[in-house]
């Protein structure tokens, strides 16, 4: 079921360096923030009608739409979003199940439940591979990488995910996907102390953003370049101070 609405689904992706714009998979454009509660109410009426008439396609569409709007309404509504994305998962076709798992992964990440988030993004990845969807696989890898890098993080896993995302984005000629991956690789390289490598990745991200006319991402990448260069200079300064202190100590012993 759900093949009729599968073609209408629009996949929206977030910037890895932004926590304010959730990466939501939705069946239609987002509702303006001020009308979200009313939109939820309308979609619930639509859902009731679908249930009464045995319309599985409409039921999947309604559950997805309600879940997404609850996510957009903020953290206080994430648990309600999970309820509807779970219902969506139960009635959806394979593309719909991919979408439901992506959204459930995002919800659990918002609730600081990384194990549940990872499990759902892994399911999404499996469905993407099953559908032979390189774009879906790229997004799933990106989401898994972001969770792996959170907090103390599993940096090797996060880097492997970002590298796979970059590979897929190149295959798809997806500039935004490449930019996402480059920024994530830059962040991870900076964490590992490979600041010159981080600068390279951020410069790639900035160039892609400029090509796409995305001033916000371009400026963000430019700031990250400055941070990475600053970290590199600081490391050089500390190394110089240590070497100077070692030379001074050696001189005192002579």
Describe the predicted segments one by one.
Residues 150-153, 187-191, 225-241, 248:
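Alpha-helical linker/edge segments of TPR/alpha-solenoid repeat scaffolds
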Residues 1, 11, 21-32, 57-74, ...:
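Conserved alpha-helical positions within TPR/SEL1-like repeat arrays
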Residues 45-52, 86-90, 123-130, 164-174, ...:
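Amphipathic alpha-helical segments of tetratricopeptide repeats
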Residues 34, 74-76, 112, 152-153, ...:
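Residue-level detector of the short coil/turn that links helix A to helix B
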């Amino acid at each position: 079921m759900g093949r009729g609405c599968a073609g209408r689904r629009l996949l929206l992706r977030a910037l890895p360096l932004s926590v304010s714009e959730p990466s939501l998979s939705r069946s239609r454009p987002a509702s303006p923030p001020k009308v979200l509660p009313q939109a939820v109410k309308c979609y619930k009426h639509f859902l009731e009608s679908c249930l009464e008439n045995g319309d599985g396609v409409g039921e999947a569409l309604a559950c997805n739409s309600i879940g997404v709007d609850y996510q957009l309404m903020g953290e206080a509504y994430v648990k309600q979003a999970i309820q509807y994305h779970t219902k969506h998962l139960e009635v959806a076709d394979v593309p719909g199940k991919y979408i439901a798992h992506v959204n459930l992964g995002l919800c659990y990440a918002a609730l600081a439940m990384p194990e549940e988030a990872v499990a759902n993004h892994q399911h999404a990845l499996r469905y993407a591979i099953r559908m032979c969807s390189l774009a879906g696989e790229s997004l799933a890898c990106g989401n898994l990488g972001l969770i792996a890098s959170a907090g103390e993080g599993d940096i090797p896993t996060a880097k492997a995910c970002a590298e796979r995302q970059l590979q897929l984005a190149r295959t798809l000629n997806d500039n935004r996907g490449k930019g996402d991956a480059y920024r994530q690789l830059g962040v991870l390289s900076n964490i590992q102390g490979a600041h010159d490598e981080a600068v390279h990745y951020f410069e790639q991200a900035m160039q892609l953003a400029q090509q796409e006319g995305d001033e916000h991402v371009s400026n963000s990448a430019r700031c990250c370049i400055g941070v990475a260069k600053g970290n590199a200079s600081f490391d050089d300064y500390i190394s110089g101070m240590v070497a100077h202190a070692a030379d001074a100590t050696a001189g005192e012993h002579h």
